[in-house]
Amino acid sequence: MTTFYTVISWLSVFGYWLLIAGVTLRILMKRRAVPSAMAWLLIIYILPLVGIIAYLSFGELHLGKRRAERAKAMWPSTARWLSELKECQHIFANSNSEVASPLFQLCERRQGINGVKGNQLQLLTTTDDTLKALVRDIELARHNIEMVFYIWQPGGLVDQVAESLMAAARRGVHCRLLLDSAGSKQFFRSPYPAMMRNAGIEVVEALKVNVFRMFLRRMDLRQHRKIVLIDNYVAYTGSMNMVDPRFFKQDAGVGQWIDMMARMEGPVATTLGIVYACDWEIETGKRILPPPPDANIMPFEEETGHTIQVIASGPGFPEEMIHQALLTAVYAAREQLIMTTPYFVPSDDLLHAICTAAQRGVDVSIIVPRENDSMMVRWASRAFFTELLNAGVKIYQFEGGLLHSKSVLVDGQLSLVGTVNLDMRSLWLNFEITLVIDDDGFGADLAQVQDDYIARSALLDGELWNKRPLWHRVTERLFYFFSPLL
C-alpha cells in the first residue's frame, strides 16, 4: 500500500510539472509580444493552477469551433460580394489628402476596398441628441433595421428606442438585434427580449457566457461594436452603448458617461452592412449580405460629401488592422495629434509612436477621464504618464464624468472615430469598428468637441506628478506589468 501511494505521489508530481512545462512551451511557441508572454509565465509560476486555468480560458484567441467554421465558410461569398461592390466605381474615392493617404492605402490593401465618398456625416455629442435622432430614423424606416451593441440597459430614453423598434417591427420592417451576452446581461434578464421577439424582432445573444463554455472559446472575447443600420442608407456608430447615462452605473462614482456617435447617410452604410452581415452569420449561421448601393435611389453628394473608410477588427477580420491603422495615423501627424480614450493601456509600439511624434515637434494631447470604472486600468494607465510627459505629451484629465469617447484627430484633417479603446483588449481581441474620415470640415467639428473636453479637464503637471507618493509608483508598476493582459 505504501508503494502504491508513493507511485501515485510521484505520478501526481510528474503530471503537475508536465502540465506546467506543456503550458509554458505552448506560450513560448505562440507568436505573441514578449511582455504578454512574460506576464503569463509569471502568473503560471506564482499561482500554477490558477494561472493555467486562466491561460486556457483567456490566454489564446479562439472563437470556438462552431463560430470558426462559420467564419471560414462565409468568406467565399463575402469575397464575391466585395468584388461586385468594386464594380460600383462611382462610390469610391480616387484621391485623399496627404496626411490621410498612407492610412487609406493600408486599408485598401489589407481590406480589399477603398474609402467610399459622397456621405453626409453628423457628429452627435450627447446621448439625448443621439437617442432622439435614432428614434426619428427608426420611425421613418421602411425596409430593415439592424443593430449591434455591447451594452443595452433598459431605462430612460433607451426604452423609447425599444418601443419605436417594436413598433417598426409590427408595421413590417425587418428588425435584427445583436447584443453581447456579458455586456447586456441586464437586458437579457429583463422582459424586453420576450417583448421584442413577440413583436417580430430577431434578438440574438452574442458570445454567450457560462462556466461550461470556458474551455471552448475565450470568454473575454466580446462583441464590442456599436452599429445601427436603417434601410441600408442611414447608419450610426461610435462609442455610445444603448444606455441612458442618467441611469447607467450610477453607483460607480465616476459620474455620467460622455460619448460621441456619428450619424451617416450614404454608401458607407453598405460597408458597415457587410461588417454586420459577417457578425450575424458568425453568430447565427444565417447569411444576410446587403444589396450594393444603387445610384438611382441613393443620392450621392460627391462634391460636398465625406470620404469614409470603415475598419473592422476581431476574429475572422484582418489581424492587427486596428493597431496598424493607429500607428499609421500617429506617424502621419506633422502638426497636431489629439487622442481621447477612456482606457489608455497602449502597446509598446503605440506608446513609442506617440512619444516620437511629440519629440519630432508634433503638438500631442491625450484626454483621459480622471476617474475610471476599472481600477486595474486606472492604475495601469498611470504607469505610462511619466514617459509621455518626458516626451512632451500633454495629458488632460477630464473632470466632467467618465469620458467614454474614442477619437483621434491628425492635423485637423484625418479623423478616427469608433469603438476602439487604446488598450490591449480593443487593439488585439474584441470585435471593434472604427471610421476613418478624410475631411477638414469634419475635423473642425471633432476639434471643437475635443476643445470642449479639454476645457473641462485639468492639465497634468509634470512636477507635481513626479512628487506623487511612493506607494502610487509601486502600485502603478505592479499593474503595468500585467498591462499586456488587460
From Swiss-Prot:
Name of the encoding gene: clsA
Keyword Lipid biosynthesis listed: yes
One Gene Ontology biological process: cardiolipin biosynthetic process
EC number: 2.7.8.-
Membrane topology annotation: Multi-pass membrane protein
Residues making up the signal peptide according to the UniProt record: none
Keyword terms: Cell inner membrane, Cell membrane, Lipid biosynthesis, Lipid metabolism, Membrane, Phospholipid biosynthesis, Phospholipid metabolism, Repeat, Transferase, Transmembrane, Transmembrane helix
EC primary class: transferase
Recorded family membership: Belongs to the phospholipase D family. Cardiolipin synthase subfamily. ClsA sub-subfamily.
Transmembrane regions listed in the UniProt entry: 3-23, 38-58
PLD phosphodiesterase domain boundaries: 219-246, 399-426
Described purpose of this protein according to its UniProt entry: Catalyzes the reversible phosphatidyl group transfer from one phosphatidylglycerol molecule to another to form cardiolipin (CL) (diphosphatidylglycerol) and glycerol.
HAMAP family named among the record's database cross-references: Cardiolipin_synth_ClsA (MF_00190)
Catalysis performed (reactions): 2 a 1,2-diacyl-sn-glycero-3-phospho-(1'-sn-glycerol) = a cardiolipin + glycerol
Protein name listed in UniProt: Cardiolipin synthase A
PROSITE patterns documented for this protein: PLD (PS50035)
Principal location: membrane
Residues at the active site: H224, K226, D231, H404, K406, D411
Localisation per UniProt entry: Cell inner membrane
GO molecular function: cardiolipin synthase activity
